[in-house]
Amino acid sequence: MYGRDPWGGPLEINAADSMTDDDRSRNLQDLDRATPSRPLDETQQSWLLGPKVLKKKKYVDLGCILVSRKIFLWTLGTIVVTALLSGFITLIVKTLPHHHHKEPPPDNYTIALRTALKFFNAQQSGKLPKNIYNVSWRHDSCLQDGKGDPGQCYKDLVGGYYDAGDSIKFNFPMSYAMTMLSWSVIEYSAKYQAAGELEHVKELIKWGTDYFLKTFNSSADNIYVMVEQVGSGVSGRGSELHNDHYCWMRPEDIHYKRTVSQCYSSCSDLAAEMAAALASASIVFKDNRLYSKNLVHGAKTLYRFATTSRNRYSQNGKESSKFYNSSMFEDELLWGGAWLYYATGNVTYLERVTSHHMAEKAGAFGNSPYYGVFSWDNKLPGAQLLLTRMRLFLSPGYPYEDMLSEFHNQTGRVMCSYLPYYKKFNRTNGGLIQLNHGAPQPLQYVANAAFLAALFSDYLEAADTPGWYCGPNFYTTEFLRNFSRSQIDYILGKNPRKMSYVVGYGQRYPKQVHHRGASIPKNMKETCTGGFKWKKSKKNNPNAINGAMVAGPDKHDGFHDIRTNYNYTEPTLAGNAGLVAALVALSGEKAVGGIDKNTMFSAVPPLVMATPPPPAPWTP
């Protein structure tokens, strides 16, 4: 039988397959009746059923917690991949050649800084501390200072620093030296830290301030006397008694009684300078609150003493006038008052130092040949810059702005005078500025000027000021740094003699320094006058007094390395302090940073600007 294929073409149908649905149903019923009626055992069931499908667990039992299976597998996979990747990276790193990145070598100024600080260790008096900075040929000395005269007010004057090539302790230049070191630390602590010398310089400052606190009644609010000098340098008729200039001997071998000079009144310059030293050091040691507080109290007491009976400490032909004669005292009052304001924040000091009268008395409006020559005697240029700092960073406004603006302008004029274009100061053919107008021992003044110029440059840069005006001409801060570098480079050896004037720096430096301790072998004990054979010797010093900046060349760039001529070869505390300050200002990379703007103002509260007086009534 054929049917029609709906897609086209015949379709053959087998007749045997044409049973009806009823027939199929009856056949199935017959099959069901043939099925055994008893239940199947498990084995038989397994023949008929497929394998049992087990449902996967969604969690993993870790004993103490249940974790999602997906999270567990993902975490495990991540750990495995990370471990493989880490191992691969480690293998690569180990197989690659290693390039060790060493720190860049220190610059010349940093090297010279480390050397220059050693001079202060060589000048220490008293029972020396045991530390890494000790000088091998120096030992305890002058342990009886202040103890031999029952008439002295202060019985313990052990400590401090010897001034130069002798063993006298002059408190006036010593105070100035400590102030300079403190100022440089306040401004450039990061650079000292980078050079590895911060703790060293702080120890040197504290050695000085600890001694100063012994030289007056530092616990009192008011005093009537202070020590100005320990030791004597009197020469000429009547000087046959043993003293520090009559004898040439190591300080360790001094056996004679050392005189103590005291000032009972008219000590304005000395007291104000020592107040500056203590006040500035109190900022350096501000984290040592008790010590800083003691320094501030002592500074206040000294400044009060300085303002009660005003006059020069070296007047009336005193011995100090032969060595460190102070030309005036008002500049110290300005200088010390500025430091006390920064140390205390007391506006009474600010009002004093910004008065027109005090500035005029200090010579701020003058134009002497030595205007701008910063030294142990003339603090005016330092005070002007110190107060300019306040105007640049605090802008206190009325009523201080007028005088602070004057100080700012005066500082600018001083900096102009340092530039070679204005010829206020001559220069040697080798380029050394003659700030003391051709007189001997020029380097201490040069180092001080180099410090002021570098510092003013950093002040301007920190205040986002690119330069300053000299009349109609504008100069960038780089002119200041070039001046500073040129003068310090001269001192370090870039001069016609190709000689460093800092002992221990460079290949060529003075070998016959005018210095008692350095000129006598350390194991040789000489009598008072027996040591003069070493002074007159043509041989080099047996002990190198590393870091000492000698007095320097003459106005023709000439220099004689002769021990007997102190105008060429004697170093001083004041000179080395200026050198250290200039070196740290120039040292290091720009990345180390410039000045620390804020530490100086750590004790200064926010200033409330006063309301200026109303203008005078207008009249037609």
From Swiss-Prot:
GO-annotated molecular function: cellulase activity
Top-level taxonomy: Eukaryota, Viridiplantae, Streptophyta, Embryophyta, Tracheophyta
Any one biological process term the GO annotation gives: response to nematode
Residue intervals on the Cytoplasmic side: 1-70
Composition bias, Basic and acidic residues: 21-39
EC number: 3.2.1.4
Gene Ontology CC: one annotated term: plasma membrane
Tissue/organ expression: Expressed in conductive tissues of young roots, cotyledons, rosette leaves, cauline leaves and sepals. Expressed in the leaf trichome support cells.
Family: Belongs to the glycosyl hydrolase 9 (cellulase E) family.
Catalytic residue positions: D166, H514, D561, E570
Membrane-crossing residue ranges in chain numbering: 71-91
Stretches for region Disordered: 1-39
Protein topology in the membrane: Single-pass type II membrane protein
Protein's UniProt keywords contain Glycoprotein: yes
Stored Pfam families: Glyco_hydro_9 (PF00759)
Glycan attachment residues as annotated in the record: N108, N134, N217, N325, N346, N409, N426, N482, N567
Catalysed conversion reaction: Endohydrolysis of (1->4)-beta-D-glucosidic linkages in cellulose, lichenin and cereal beta-D-glucans
Gene this chain is encoded by: KOR3
Keyword annotations: Carbohydrate metabolism, Cell membrane, Cell wall biogenesis/degradation, Cellulose degradation, Glycoprotein, Glycosidase, Hydrolase, Membrane, Polysaccharide degradation, Signal-anchor, Transmembrane, Transmembrane helix
Cellular location(s): Cell membrane
Classification via InterPro entries: 6-hairpin_glycosidase_sf, 6hp_glycosidase-like_sf, Glyco_hydro_9, Glyco_hydro_9_Asp/Glu_AS, Glyco_hydro_9_His_AS
Entry protein name: Endoglucanase 21
Organism for this UniProt entry: Arabidopsis thaliana (Mouse-ear cress)
Extracellular membrane side: 92-620
Matches recorded under SUPFAM superfamilies: Six-hairpin glycosidases
The keyword Transmembrane belongs to this UniProt entry's keyword annotation: yes
